[in-house]
Amino acid sequence: MRLIPLAQAAQVGKWAAAHIAKRINDFKPTAERPFVLGLPTGGTPLATYKALIELYQAGEVSFEHVVTFNMDEYIGIPADHPESYRSFMYTNFFNHVNIQEANINLLNGNAEDHEAECQRYEDKIKSYGKINLFMGGVGNDGHIAFNEPASSLSSRTRIKTLTEDTRIANSRFFDGDINQVPKYALTIGVGTLLDAEEVMILVTGHNKALALEAAVEGSVNHLWTVSALQLHPKAVIVCDEPSQQELKVKTVKYFSELEAENIKGF
C-alpha cells in the first residue's frame, strides 16, 4: 500500500487529479480500448473534480475515451433530485469535461428490480474486463462506497441499509434533516472495488483520522471495510494532515520519506 501524506485537503485534490490524468495519458485510450475509471461522490472528491476540470480546460487530459462507473446511488429519490448522485456527478464533473454520455455508467436507484440492476452493473463492469483505476472516499466509520461496518469483504454490487451515523453525516446535504436522507442505497461491493487494477482512496479532515488509522495500521477487519485495501496489490491512500492525527509519527515519517519525490510540487 502507498500512503501520500500531504498538508491540506486542496493538495489532496490536486495530487489525485494529477495521478488520474497521468494514468489516462499513459494508457493512451482509444474508442476500442477505453480507460475505465471508477468515481465517488461526497465532499472529499470535490477538490479532485475541480482540479480535473482545470487540467481538461488546460488541454492536459481528455475524457473522450474514458468510461466511468460510479460507486453508489440512493434508492427512492428521483434521478433529477439535486442530491441524487447522478445530479452530483453531472453538476460537479460530467457537464464540464468532454466525456461521452454513452460512456457514463450510474446505478439506477429507481429500477423496478434492484437485484437485477445490481447484476446488470456487475456485468457491465466485466464487459470492459476491469476498472483501471477506482477513486473513492471513506466514511468516519471506515466505510468505502456504502459498504457499512460488518459488510463482507468479498461483497458485490447490492442493496445496503444505511447506518444512522451515515445518514446523520449525509444530512448536511439535505438541509440538516435526517428524515430526508434515504435509508437504502445501491452500492458496489468491497469485492467489486478490490477487482479494480488500482484503487485510490482520498482521506481528508480530522473526523476521518480513526478510519485512516484502521486502514493503514490496523488489521484487515470487516468492521472497517477500508482496511480491505491492505489486500490489494496496487492501493494508494492520499491524505491531509488533519486526517493523519491518529497515525504513529514514525508511520507518517516513513511514507513521507518513501514518497518524497512524488509529493514534490504539491
From Swiss-Prot:
Listed EC numbers: 3.5.99.6
Regulation: Allosterically activated by N-acetylglucosamine 6-phosphate (GlcNAc6P).
Catalysed reactions listed for this entry: alpha-D-glucosamine 6-phosphate + H2O = beta-D-fructose 6-phosphate + NH4(+)
Site (Part of the allosteric site): S151, R158, K160, T161, Y254
Keywords: Allosteric enzyme, Carbohydrate metabolism, Hydrolase
Alphabetical list of Gene3D superfamilies matching this protein: 3.40.50.1360
Name of the top EC class for this enzyme: hydrolase
GO molecular function annotations of the record: glucosamine-6-phosphate deaminase activity; identical protein binding
GO cellular component: cytoplasm
Active site positions: D72 (proton acceptor), D141 (for ring-opening step), H143 (proton acceptor), E148 (for ring-opening step)
Pathway in which the depicted protein is active: Amino-sugar metabolism; N-acetylneuraminate degradation; D-fructose 6-phosphate from N-acetylneuraminate: step 5/5
A GO BP entry: glucosamine catabolic process
Pfam families: Glucosamine_iso
Family in the record: Belongs to the glucosamine/galactosamine-6-phosphate isomerase family. NagB subfamily.
NCBIfam families in UniProt: nagB (TIGR00502), PRK00443.1-5 (NF001685)
Record text on subunit structure and interactions: Homohexamer.
Role this protein plays: Catalyzes the reversible isomerization-deamination of glucosamine 6-phosphate (GlcN6P) to form fructose 6-phosphate (Fru6P) and ammonium ion.
Stated name of the protein: Glucosamine-6-phosphate deaminase
Organism phylogeny: Bacteria, Pseudomonadati, Pseudomonadota, Gammaproteobacteria, Vibrionales
Name of the gene encoding the protein in the UniProt record: nagB
